[in-house]
Amino acid sequence: MKQVVKTIKRTIFAVALFACISSCTSDDDIDDIFIERGWTLTYIQEGGVRRNTEGKKYSILFGEAAFTATTPDGSTITGEWKADGGTRSFTCYNVRSSSNFQKDTIAKSMLNLLKNARKYEGDTHWLRIKQQENVYMLLGSEK
């Protein structure tokens, strides 16, 4: 009888473990992270130089396929994007701006980073869009 109970317990444990493992995935939920979520720029890291926003609001809103970034003076950066939750690759294309950002170095860096983005890291609370390991922008969720 003890052997039967032991076998039943092991079977239940194995089934529960299998269900738990098979329902887990390492892929990010792209829709939850990006789609219709507003992000505020915290800073841009360019090698050893960190460019803080100094209290000015730079924001990005991702739609299903397009994005719009807004600078404090109302200028915009627009384009299309795609991301892969498995590899965490991130690219923007058809990126355009309404200004050349001669006096706004943060907006100029943001534009360059979006044009050359390769990866992302993060979740629904924070997001790092990366051009390379030490060149990225850090964003905080507005939700």
Indicate where each model-derived feature is located.
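N-terminal hydrophobic targeting signals that begin at the initiator methionine
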Residues: 1-2, 25
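Lipid interaction determinants
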Residues: 25-78, 82-143
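Bacterial N-terminal signal peptides that target proteins for export
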Residues: 2-12
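C-terminal motif of bacterial Sec signal peptides marking the signal peptidase cleavage site
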Residues: 20-23
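Short, linear, compositionally biased motifs with a strong N-terminal bias
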Residues: 14-18
